[in-house]
Each structure stands twice: as structure tokens, then as C-alpha cells.
């Protein structure tokens, strides 16, 4: 006869199930399990006296007969598409199946086969998310990659060549020679990488050669001159070669205002960086572009969320990042024109409304590369505290808000940059770039990061201990070394470079994948973040209105996922 056990006992053994709720870290965000794809009474679990043993939950089937390489058991999947529990089967570095794992010879309803060649990762009581994507990287130093990976980011996209002054200010890897060297350098790192060429030119030849060399996208930056002519030329090349264009507009309004920039864009797809404006862009009203159908608006994390310290720290950051001089009044005025508490406050609310679609870092160039995920969830917490539950929520949970915010650093940047056929969600057929979290540490410290189905970093204790013992901290694992690194991570390039055999030409050890589908998309393609309010900015007070409503909120003095999580 069937046995009954309490919900708490079940959750302790197999993880939460349908209707159970749990808190994310020390935030005020509560998620509820929407459905459970496992079968009560037939759950699989590894360990002494448990289910996954020969002839029980483990079948005799070989890999050739369909057995998985790895199964993550009883995981609580947190994805833009939903919050649900399932077993996840991995094969050949990709997500082969999401459903019910086990032995089809002894158990009903099994669609994920466990065999003698299957490794098990225990997902009970853990949250499983897609690896994050940071789409605004200044490649100033290689050490950024470790900080980013260990925070839960598995794909980094941006530009640079190291601590050259062009890179310190702009996310561009300029020219075929530098692009080639950075593609070769990418072979050393256990993370997916993609590089942006410089998009500032008035004639196409200099841009086309960068795309053919391997640039996956092009960046227009005001420090190189984001004029209407450069915007038009860059977008024309991008449309012809299917790469995305990112734009940092003209803060000083020297070559036109936001309306002139939108006219130069001409309805074509573009990814607008730090659309609030503190990171740069038409002062004071670049934020208006969140209402444009063809613009994908994103934020960088130094303004996210708005706190008691946000405004104060930004002036110094600006002076350093843009090679400014405090002794020159015009340089100081330039910096001060970009820091507006009114637009920074409005940014939080526009994210909560789903009007801003992406969050990224702006690494070492006014952003913190290891805090994209943390600051996303701090912002979601702040908005719940200040604005209450979203009107779209059903039940005693924050599922809709949580799904909206996770989309900002997973699926939406992947769609924007033509990578969503490979990454961005927990979905069958996509790369097994996955992150496991203990709920109490969600958003702060991942338990484990998988890249291409192999563990590349994890919380690990004393290597000399008889068991993994405290202190635990995130360390690189076997997937981050040797040939496994090259088999697990990939480098994203343009279709033109892929067709030209860029991997063979540069003797790359990592595989390359081509971006595709970057043109003709827009705000409507941003999952759960497609809202297009009409934005007005008062040019004297900087007051922001969305569809006539004033957008303002107070800075927080204390945040979750902060100092208590980072004592060491």
C-alpha cells in the first residue's frame, strides 16, 4: 500500500515538491514549486541504501542504448519559463532530457535512463539555473574571468585587449590582429567567450574585416565618436553580416540628441548599454529609448540597486574610467552630467516593470564583474520591499518577479546576441551550462558550476581533509584544466568567421559556434521584459515619468546577499 509522509520529511529527503515554498538567500523573495515531473514513490536518489543501485534505479543500458552521461536528480529548476522540479539528463555536454530519471526496466514513466556509465549529481534541496551571461565586459585583465565564473556566469561577451586605455574605457577589441590574439587567449579559460569589434567608422571596410576576423558583434562607443554617420555605417554592416550592435551614445550631445540617434538607428535592432545614463549616453534623457520597439535596453550593475552609496561612488569611478582630469572643469562637468539620482531611482522601477530587459556588469570600467547575479536579486528584493507584490502574481509567492529578473541575465542577453539556440535557459537541446545553488546561498555563492556538462568550479573544503571539511570556498575543478577545458567551453564568433574556418586558421583549441538571428529582433523578443512605456525626462529636475506616472523610489541603506555572505 502507498505510504504517506509529511511535506517536511519529503522535502528533506527528495527536495521540495509542488506547492512547497522557499526563500531565496536572505531576501524577501519567496518562490513556490509550480509542478513536479518526478513520480511520487519512484524518486531516484543516490547513496547507501538508496535507489540508484544496480537492478533498482540503475539499468543495464549502455550509453549506446541511450543511458545518460550525467543525471541531476530532483532539482528545483528556476528558469524564466517556470519554477518546477525535475530530473535533468545530460549527454554530450548538452541537456538531453528534463523529466523523470531511473531504470525503465523496473520503474514506470522513465524518460531519462540511468545506466552503469551514468554519473549522478544530487539536486535534492538545490536550485538549478542556467549559467548567467554577462554581455558588457571590458576585458581589462584575465583575472576577471575567475571572479565571474565563480559567481555563476558561464558566458562573457565584450571587448578589449587588456589594460590598454582604449579597453579601460570602451568594450572594443579593435581590428583583426587584436581579435585574433584574443580568440587565441580565450583557449586558456574555462568559460564561454565572445568578442566585440570596434563599430565606430563611417565606411564599412574597417568593420567588415573585424567581423570576418571573428568579432561576434560590434560596439559603438562615444569615446571613439558615436556620430549619426558611424551609427548608420555600423548598423548597415551588422544587418548584412548578422551580428549585434551595442551602443554607448553621446553624453555631451555634440553630434545630436537622443532623437537624432534614434533617427540614425532608423528602426534597426540595437542593444543600448547602461540605458539609465550613469554609464554614459545622451544626458539627461537617454533613458527614453526604453520605449522604442527596436532597442534592447540594458543596465550595468554599479547603479543596481539604488542605495545610500550609489551616487557618491560614481563620480570617482567616472573620472578613472574615462581618463578624465579633476583639474579640468570641463572634465568634472562631463562626469557630473551623467550622475542623476532621479534617473537612477527610476531605473530600479523600470526593471521591476519589465521595461529594462538585461543586466550586465561593465567590468572594471564602472562595474563589478562578480556581482551581476547578486545585484540582480538585490534589486528584485528592493522592489518587493518598496513596491510590494507584482499585480501579475498568483498565490503566496513571487514567482513572476523572480522569473522576470532571472531572464535579465540568462535568456534575454542570449537572445540579444544570437546565442539563445545554445545557451540562456534550462531547456532540452541547449548546452549544459548550469549552476546549482543551496537556497540559503542563492544569488551569492553557487554550490557548483557546470560548463558543457562538466563541473568547472564548486564549493570545496580542505583538500587534505579525510572528508571535504570547512572552510569551504569556490575552487576550480577538473573541467577547468587540460583538454577538458577546451572540450567544455566554446568561443562564439560571427557566421563569416565560422565559414572562413577561424578555428583552423588561428589553431584554436576550443570549439567555435556562430551567432545567428541578431537582426530583426527587438523589445518584443525579451522574455518577461518587453514593456514599452512612454518615457519623459524633465531636463531641469531630471524627474522621470512613464506613461505620465512619476517614477521615484528611495535608496536602501541595507541590502540582502551582502556582508554576511562574504566574511571570507
Swiss-Prot record:
Subcellular location, record wording: Cytoplasm
Residues annotated as binding Ni(2+) 2: 219, 248, 274
Reaction(s) this enzyme catalyzes, per UniProt: urea + 2 H2O + H(+) = hydrogencarbonate + 2 NH4(+)
Post-translational modification: Carboxylation allows a single lysine to coordinate two nickel ions.
Keyword annotations of the record: Cytoplasm, Hydrolase, Metal-binding, Nickel
Listed pathway(s): Nitrogen metabolism; urea degradation; CO(2) and NH(3) from urea (urease route): step 1/1
Top EC group: hydrolase
CDD domains per record: Urease_alpha (cd00375)
Gene Ontology biological-process entries: urea catabolic process
Co-factor requirement: Ni cation
Quaternary data: Heterotrimer of UreA (gamma), UreB (beta) and UreC (alpha) subunits. Three heterotrimers associate to form the active enzyme.
HAMAP family, sorted: Urease_alpha (MF_01953)
Family of this protein: Belongs to the metallo-dependent hydrolases superfamily. Urease alpha subunit family.
UniProt-recorded name of the protein: Urease subunit alpha
Organism: Cereibacter sphaeroides (strain ATCC 17025 / ATH 2.4.3)
Gene name per UniProt: ureC
